[in-house]
Amino acid sequence: MINRFLIALSFLTVLPLKFKEINEKELIRSIIFFPFIGFLEGVFCIFLVNIFKQIFSSSVISIILLVFLFSVRGIFHIDGLSDTFDALFYKGTGQKEKDLQQRLQIMKDSVIGVAGAVALVLDVLCRFAFVKELIDINQFLIFLFMFCFSRWIVIPLMYYGKPARTTGLGVLFIGKISSWQVIISTVLPIFLLVYFTIEKNFIFLPLIALFLFFISYILKKFFERKFNGITGDHLGATVEITEIVFLICFLLGEKLWLSY
Protein backbone atom coordinates (compact mmCIF):
# COMPACT_ATOMS: atom_id res chain seq x y z
CA MET A 1 0.00 0.00 0.00
CA ILE A 2 2.83 2.41 0.87
CA ASN A 3 4.51 1.47 -2.39
CA ARG A 4 1.38 2.46 -4.32
CA PHE A 5 1.21 5.76 -2.48
CA LEU A 6 4.83 6.49 -3.43
CA ILE A 7 4.09 5.55 -7.04
CA ALA A 8 1.16 7.98 -7.10
CA LEU A 9 3.28 10.69 -5.48
CA SER A 10 6.05 10.17 -8.00
CA PHE A 11 3.62 10.09 -10.94
CA LEU A 12 1.83 13.32 -10.01
CA THR A 13 4.88 15.25 -8.83
CA VAL A 14 8.52 15.75 -9.75
CA LEU A 15 9.77 14.24 -6.48
CA PRO A 16 12.54 11.66 -7.15
CA LEU A 17 11.22 8.71 -5.15
CA LYS A 18 12.29 5.09 -5.08
CA PHE A 19 9.93 2.12 -4.82
CA LYS A 20 10.16 -1.58 -4.21
CA GLU A 21 8.27 -2.36 -7.39
CA ILE A 22 6.67 -0.44 -10.22
CA ASN A 23 4.72 -1.92 -13.10
CA GLU A 24 1.57 -1.15 -15.03
CA LYS A 25 -0.63 -3.05 -12.58
CA GLU A 26 0.75 -1.19 -9.55
CA LEU A 27 0.54 2.13 -11.39
CA ILE A 28 -3.16 1.60 -12.14
CA ARG A 29 -3.86 0.63 -8.53
CA SER A 30 -2.06 3.74 -7.28
CA ILE A 31 -4.84 6.02 -8.56
CA ILE A 32 -6.78 5.58 -5.29
CA PHE A 33 -4.15 7.88 -3.75
CA PHE A 34 -4.60 10.69 -6.30
CA PRO A 35 -7.08 12.64 -4.11
CA PHE A 36 -4.79 12.24 -1.10
CA ILE A 37 -1.89 13.70 -3.10
CA GLY A 38 -4.10 16.70 -3.84
CA PHE A 39 -4.99 16.93 -0.15
CA LEU A 40 -1.27 17.07 0.71
CA GLU A 41 -0.78 19.86 -1.83
CA GLY A 42 -3.50 21.75 0.01
CA VAL A 43 -1.83 21.12 3.36
CA PHE A 44 1.48 22.55 2.16
CA CYS A 45 -0.21 25.55 0.53
CA ILE A 46 -2.00 26.35 3.80
CA PHE A 47 1.28 25.92 5.66
CA LEU A 48 2.98 28.42 3.34
CA VAL A 49 0.16 30.94 3.71
CA ASN A 50 0.34 30.74 7.51
CA ILE A 51 4.11 31.22 7.44
CA PHE A 52 4.14 34.24 5.13
CA LYS A 53 0.86 36.05 5.83
CA GLN A 54 2.46 38.14 8.59
CA ILE A 55 5.38 39.04 6.35
CA PHE A 56 4.16 39.54 2.79
CA SER A 57 1.08 40.85 1.04
CA SER A 58 -1.50 38.46 -0.38
CA SER A 59 -0.15 39.17 -3.88
CA VAL A 60 3.33 37.97 -2.94
CA ILE A 61 1.93 34.93 -1.14
CA SER A 62 -0.15 34.06 -4.20
CA ILE A 63 3.01 34.10 -6.32
CA ILE A 64 4.81 31.95 -3.74
CA LEU A 65 2.02 29.37 -3.94
CA LEU A 66 2.13 29.34 -7.73
CA VAL A 67 5.89 28.81 -7.67
CA PHE A 68 5.47 26.04 -5.10
CA LEU A 69 2.82 24.23 -7.16
CA PHE A 70 4.90 24.53 -10.32
CA SER A 71 7.97 23.25 -8.46
CA VAL A 72 6.06 20.23 -7.14
CA ARG A 73 3.90 19.43 -10.15
CA GLY A 74 6.31 20.41 -12.88
CA ILE A 75 4.68 20.87 -16.29
CA PHE A 76 2.56 17.73 -15.98
CA HIS A 77 -0.86 19.44 -16.05
CA ILE A 78 -0.15 22.78 -17.71
CA ASP A 79 1.50 20.99 -20.62
CA GLY A 80 -1.72 19.04 -21.08
CA LEU A 81 -3.70 22.27 -20.97
CA SER A 82 -1.58 23.99 -23.61
CA ASP A 83 -1.46 20.94 -25.89
CA THR A 84 -5.22 20.50 -25.64
CA PHE A 85 -5.95 24.12 -26.55
CA ASP A 86 -3.47 24.07 -29.44
CA ALA A 87 -5.24 21.01 -30.83
CA LEU A 88 -8.73 22.42 -30.27
CA PHE A 89 -7.91 25.62 -32.15
CA TYR A 90 -6.73 23.71 -35.22
CA LYS A 91 -9.11 24.96 -37.93
CA GLY A 92 -9.38 21.65 -39.76
CA THR A 93 -9.96 20.67 -43.37
CA GLY A 94 -13.50 19.38 -43.05
CA GLN A 95 -12.33 15.77 -43.36
CA LYS A 96 -13.21 14.19 -40.03
CA GLU A 97 -10.59 11.43 -39.91
CA LYS A 98 -7.78 13.61 -41.21
CA ASP A 99 -8.62 16.40 -38.74
CA LEU A 100 -8.78 13.89 -35.89
CA GLN A 101 -5.30 12.57 -36.63
CA GLN A 102 -3.95 16.10 -37.03
CA ARG A 103 -5.31 17.16 -33.63
CA LEU A 104 -3.70 14.14 -32.00
CA GLN A 105 -0.44 14.93 -33.77
CA ILE A 106 -0.54 18.56 -32.60
CA MET A 107 -0.79 17.39 -28.99
CA LYS A 108 2.36 15.32 -29.46
CA ASP A 109 4.26 18.29 -30.89
CA SER A 110 6.69 19.76 -28.34
CA VAL A 111 6.33 23.26 -29.84
CA ILE A 112 3.68 25.38 -28.12
CA GLY A 113 1.25 27.29 -30.32
CA VAL A 114 -0.54 30.60 -29.84
CA ALA A 115 -3.68 29.01 -28.39
CA GLY A 116 -1.65 26.98 -25.93
CA ALA A 117 0.35 30.03 -24.87
CA VAL A 118 -2.81 32.07 -24.33
CA ALA A 119 -4.32 29.23 -22.27
CA LEU A 120 -1.22 29.11 -20.06
CA VAL A 121 -1.17 32.87 -19.51
CA LEU A 122 -4.87 32.93 -18.63
CA ASP A 123 -4.40 29.96 -16.31
CA VAL A 124 -1.59 31.67 -14.39
CA LEU A 125 -3.38 35.03 -14.24
CA CYS A 126 -6.62 33.47 -13.00
CA ARG A 127 -4.81 31.44 -10.37
CA PHE A 128 -2.90 34.45 -9.15
CA ALA A 129 -5.99 36.66 -8.89
CA PHE A 130 -8.32 34.08 -7.36
CA VAL A 131 -5.79 32.67 -4.89
CA LYS A 132 -4.98 36.23 -3.80
CA GLU A 133 -8.69 36.83 -3.23
CA LEU A 134 -8.99 33.64 -1.16
CA ILE A 135 -6.13 34.78 1.04
CA ASP A 136 -7.64 38.26 1.38
CA ILE A 137 -10.94 36.85 2.70
CA ASN A 138 -9.09 34.32 4.87
CA GLN A 139 -10.71 31.26 3.28
CA PHE A 140 -7.57 29.48 2.12
CA LEU A 141 -8.44 26.32 4.10
CA ILE A 142 -10.60 25.40 1.13
CA PHE A 143 -7.36 24.49 -0.67
CA LEU A 144 -7.70 21.11 1.05
CA PHE A 145 -10.90 20.32 -0.80
CA MET A 146 -10.02 22.06 -4.06
CA PHE A 147 -6.81 20.17 -4.74
CA CYS A 148 -8.25 16.89 -3.47
CA PHE A 149 -11.31 17.24 -5.71
CA SER A 150 -9.34 18.28 -8.79
CA ARG A 151 -7.20 15.15 -8.47
CA TRP A 152 -10.29 13.01 -7.97
CA ILE A 153 -12.30 14.43 -10.88
CA VAL A 154 -10.11 12.68 -13.47
CA ILE A 155 -10.79 9.24 -11.96
CA PRO A 156 -14.40 9.05 -13.25
CA LEU A 157 -13.05 10.21 -16.63
CA MET A 158 -10.60 7.31 -16.58
CA TYR A 159 -13.36 4.89 -15.60
CA TYR A 160 -16.00 5.94 -18.14
CA GLY A 161 -13.74 7.22 -20.90
CA LYS A 162 -12.02 5.50 -23.79
CA PRO A 163 -8.43 6.15 -24.90
CA ALA A 164 -7.91 8.25 -28.02
CA ARG A 165 -4.52 6.67 -28.67
CA THR A 166 -2.92 3.26 -28.35
CA THR A 167 0.20 4.81 -26.80
CA GLY A 168 0.92 7.41 -24.13
CA LEU A 169 0.39 7.78 -20.39
CA GLY A 170 -3.37 8.03 -20.72
CA VAL A 171 -3.58 4.50 -22.11
CA LEU A 172 -2.28 3.16 -18.79
CA PHE A 173 -5.39 4.38 -16.95
CA ILE A 174 -8.26 5.25 -19.28
CA GLY A 175 -10.80 2.46 -19.42
CA LYS A 176 -8.70 0.22 -17.17
CA ILE A 177 -9.60 1.16 -13.60
CA SER A 178 -12.21 -0.73 -11.60
CA SER A 179 -15.38 0.46 -9.88
CA TRP A 180 -13.92 -0.26 -6.44
CA GLN A 181 -11.03 2.08 -7.19
CA VAL A 182 -13.53 4.82 -8.03
CA ILE A 183 -15.42 4.14 -4.78
CA ILE A 184 -12.32 4.10 -2.56
CA SER A 185 -10.91 7.24 -4.15
CA THR A 186 -14.20 9.04 -3.47
CA VAL A 187 -14.04 8.60 0.33
CA LEU A 188 -11.67 11.50 1.08
CA PRO A 189 -13.37 14.05 -1.22
CA ILE A 190 -16.77 13.17 0.29
CA PHE A 191 -15.41 13.49 3.82
CA LEU A 192 -13.93 16.92 3.07
CA LEU A 193 -17.12 17.99 1.32
CA VAL A 194 -19.22 17.09 4.37
CA TYR A 195 -16.71 18.70 6.74
CA PHE A 196 -16.56 22.05 4.95
CA THR A 197 -20.30 22.09 4.33
CA ILE A 198 -21.25 21.44 7.96
CA GLU A 199 -18.33 22.66 10.07
CA LYS A 200 -17.34 25.67 7.95
CA ASN A 201 -20.90 26.45 6.84
CA PHE A 202 -20.05 26.40 3.13
CA ILE A 203 -23.57 25.27 2.27
CA PHE A 204 -23.02 26.07 -1.42
CA LEU A 205 -20.05 23.67 -1.69
CA PRO A 206 -22.10 20.58 -2.69
CA LEU A 207 -23.60 22.59 -5.55
CA ILE A 208 -20.12 23.56 -6.72
CA ALA A 209 -19.02 19.91 -6.57
CA LEU A 210 -22.04 18.83 -8.63
CA PHE A 211 -21.41 21.61 -11.13
CA LEU A 212 -17.76 20.59 -11.51
CA PHE A 213 -18.78 16.97 -11.99
CA PHE A 214 -21.16 18.14 -14.71
CA ILE A 215 -18.34 20.17 -16.30
CA SER A 216 -16.11 17.07 -16.33
CA TYR A 217 -18.90 15.13 -18.07
CA ILE A 218 -19.22 17.87 -20.70
CA LEU A 219 -15.44 17.85 -21.19
CA LYS A 220 -15.47 14.06 -21.60
CA LYS A 221 -18.14 14.24 -24.31
CA PHE A 222 -16.36 17.15 -25.98
CA PHE A 223 -12.98 15.40 -26.02
CA GLU A 224 -14.52 12.21 -27.38
CA ARG A 225 -16.21 14.18 -30.16
CA LYS A 226 -13.08 16.12 -31.12
CA PHE A 227 -10.44 13.43 -30.51
CA ASN A 228 -12.47 10.21 -30.55
CA GLY A 229 -11.40 9.55 -26.97
CA ILE A 230 -9.39 10.90 -24.06
CA THR A 231 -5.63 11.31 -23.70
CA GLY A 232 -3.33 12.04 -20.79
CA ASP A 233 -3.19 15.66 -21.97
CA HIS A 234 -6.96 15.90 -21.57
CA LEU A 235 -6.73 14.61 -18.02
CA GLY A 236 -4.12 17.24 -17.18
CA ALA A 237 -6.23 19.95 -18.80
CA THR A 238 -9.24 18.79 -16.80
CA VAL A 239 -7.32 19.22 -13.53
CA GLU A 240 -6.34 22.77 -14.48
CA ILE A 241 -9.82 23.72 -15.67
CA THR A 242 -11.45 22.19 -12.58
CA GLU A 243 -9.29 24.23 -10.22
CA ILE A 244 -9.92 27.50 -12.05
CA VAL A 245 -13.68 26.94 -12.24
CA PHE A 246 -13.73 25.91 -8.58
CA LEU A 247 -11.99 29.12 -7.52
CA ILE A 248 -14.45 31.22 -9.52
CA CYS A 249 -17.50 29.38 -8.16
CA PHE A 250 -16.28 29.36 -4.57
CA LEU A 251 -15.47 33.07 -4.51
CA LEU A 252 -18.79 33.86 -6.17
CA GLY A 253 -20.65 31.64 -3.71
CA GLU A 254 -18.86 33.22 -0.76
CA LYS A 255 -19.67 36.74 -1.94
CA LEU A 256 -23.34 35.90 -2.53
CA TRP A 257 -23.62 34.08 0.80
CA LEU A 258 -22.12 37.00 2.73
CA SER A 259 -24.35 39.51 0.95
CA TYR A 260 -27.41 37.37 1.72
Swiss-Prot record:
Keywords: Cell inner membrane, Cell membrane, Cobalamin biosynthesis, Magnesium, Membrane, Transferase, Transmembrane, Transmembrane helix. The keyword Membrane applies. GO terms for biological process: cobalamin biosynthetic process. One of its GO terms (cellular component) is plasma membrane. Joins adenosylcobinamide-GDP and alpha-ribazole to generate adenosylcobalamin (Ado-cobalamin). Also synthesizes adenosylcobalamin 5'-phosphate from adenosylcobinamide-GDP and alpha-ribazole 5'-phosphate. It catalyses: alpha-ribazole + adenosylcob(III)inamide-GDP = adenosylcob(III)alamin + GMP + H(+); alpha-ribazole 5'-phosphate + adenosylcob(III)inamide-GDP = adenosylcob(III)alamin 5'-phosphate + GMP + H(+). One of its GO terms (molecular function) is adenosylcobinamide-GDP ribazoletransferase activity. Its EC number is 2.7.8.26. This is Adenosylcobinamide-GDP ribazoletransferase. It is found in: Cell inner membrane. Pathway: Cofactor biosynthesis; adenosylcobalamin biosynthesis; adenosylcobalamin from cob(II)yrinate a,c-diamide: step 7/7. It is a multi-pass membrane protein. The chain crosses the membrane at residues 31-51, 55-75, 111-131, 140-160, 177-197, 202-222, 234-254. InterPro entries: CobS (IPR003805). The lineage of its organism: Bacteria, Pseudomonadati, Nitrospirota, Thermodesulfovibrionia, Thermodesulfovibrionales.
